[in-house]
Amino acid sequence: MQEFNFNNMKREIMFVLAMLITANIVSAQRVDDKPYATGADISWLQWQEDSGIRFSDGGVEGDAIDILRDNGFNYIRLRLFVNPKSELGYSQRDGYCDLEHTLAMAKRIKEAGMLFLLDFHYSDNWADPGKQIMPQAWQTLSYEEVCQEVYNHTKATLEALVAQGTAPDMVQVGNEISNGMLWPYGSVRHSFSGLCGLLKEGVRAVREVTPNAEIMLHVALGGQAEESERFFDAMAEYGVEYDLIGQSYYPEWHGTLEELEANLRAMAKRYKKPLIVVEYRDHFLAIDSIVRSLPRGLGRGTFIWEATSPQWGKLFDEKGAATAALDDYNR
């Protein structure tokens, strides 16, 4: 167990208070009328439920989605894999995070009156800065054919969601694509050209099928200013269309809270796009205050990753009971 450090605790409290004061000043200056997202990724929820976990708040059992809504959340994020049952897949037996499971979850989200962010991974398994593995069914295709598959997969998914009345309000074209996606074609090691061609096909499908959905480009560079600038300058150079910037922020990989704030402020000034910290695990109050304080109201929200996981989001314990951490959102 680590020794309690009063000075560190005091420093974080003072940081949060300062950011809250600034946020109140800026909040009336929003550049659009879109709702501020207090969001949760709950992509693990169906597996938990099928494993017998029942969720509760204050001893009262209920749907985890409803519990989150009743405690201040208004947005739910779901990841989508191309074929999680493939030999390379995330869920070879049950197919969690496939289209069928996503359709079922989307109904629950909309029935709860919440907004919906769909996260396309364009892989059969986890896509992140360290791996962006081509779906098994696409691995023998040419670059041009993979571009077409990105369009087809995005279009078919969104058409299925629209058909059941659960169109997403926001769409991520790729997950943590700091180093590209759909390697090797979309790697940015030597050039952004391949990635940008792939992104344009995903964006085209989103615009055609769900024109009211906002499009996010998501990188994992929370406190890394130089790398963030390199990425989004390339998006401008190659003419990739998007509406929002998404950042992941985990301190062990992405720097201090001060570095996160400095980077988000620099990005707001340089790109004039709304920004969301679309993945984080800890420090909600500080992160939320930073985002709310961004100039011109360009801070558009936060999403805690795996909110229902006792190991990650920690808003519920191993038995599914809401923890005290949930109180921070209900204010």
Language model region names:
Residues 1-30:
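Bacterial Sec-dependent N-terminal signal peptides
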Residues 28-73:
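N-terminal carbohydrate-binding accessory modules
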Residues 38-40, 76-78, 116-120, 169-173, ...:
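Hydrophobic faces of well-ordered beta-strands that scaffold small-molecule active sites
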Residues 42-45, 81-83, 121-125, 173-178, ...:
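Active-site beta-loop-alpha junctions enriched in small/polar residues
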Residues 60-127, 189-216, 262-264, 268-270:
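Aromatic-lined substrate-binding rim segments of carbohydrate-active enzymes
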Residues 69, 110, 162, 236-238, ...:
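Non-catalytic positions within long, well-ordered alpha-helices that form the structural scaffold/packing
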Residues 92, 97-101, 127-235, 240-242, ...:
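Active-site cleft segment of glycoside hydrolase catalytic domains centered on the general acid/base Glu
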Residues 252, 273-331:
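Substrate-binding cleft of secreted/luminal carbohydrate-active enzymes
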